[in-house]
Amino acid sequence: MKLLLHICCAPCANRPLADLKAQGHDVTGFWYNPNIHPFTEYRARRNTVRDYLQEIGVPLIEQNDYGLRPFVRAVAEDIPGRCVKCYEMRLFRAAEVAKAQGFDGFTSSLFISPYQKHDLMKEVAEKAAETFGVEFFYQDFRPLFRAGQDFAREHGFYKIGRAHV
C-alpha cells in the first residue's frame, strides 16, 4: 500500500516507519505541525525529521507554513477541546494531501504515543478519511514506543524541549 505517514517528530516516527516498511508498504513522510511552538522547537523537530528521512531514503512532503496563528485561533475558543482541534488540523490535512497526491491511505506517528488520546485520534482520522475519500490505515504503534525512544537516544535525535538554536 502507498501510505502517507504524518510525522510529529523523528523519535515517534522511526519505529512506525521501520514497521510499515517491513510490512511492505511504500511510505512517504508528511510534515505538517502548526501546533508546535516556539519556532525554534518547530525548526529543530522538522530538521531532525528531514535529516532522518533523507538518511533512510524515505521521501518527505513538507507543509512548512508555520501555522501557529491559525492553530491558536482554532483552539483559543475551546481550550477543553483543544486536543480534537489539533488532531483535526493535522489529520485532515494528511488525508487531504494523501488523496490529492494519489496515496492509497494515510496514518500518523502520533499513534505511537502513550500520552496522546488514542481513541479520539482514531475517530478524527476516520472522519478525515471519509471526508476526503481516502483510506485511514490504522495501526496501534504504542507497543513500539519504548524501542522508538531508545533508537532516538542511540542515534542522537533531537528530543522535544531541547531546541538547537
Question: Where are the model-predicted features located?
Answer:
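ATP-dependent adenylation/nucleotidyltransferase module used to activate substrates
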Residues: 1-144
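Short, surface-exposed amphipathic charged segments that create phosphate/polyanion-binding patches used
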Residues: 74-81, 148-158
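Conserved small/polar residues in nucleotide/adenosyl-binding loops
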Residues: 163-165
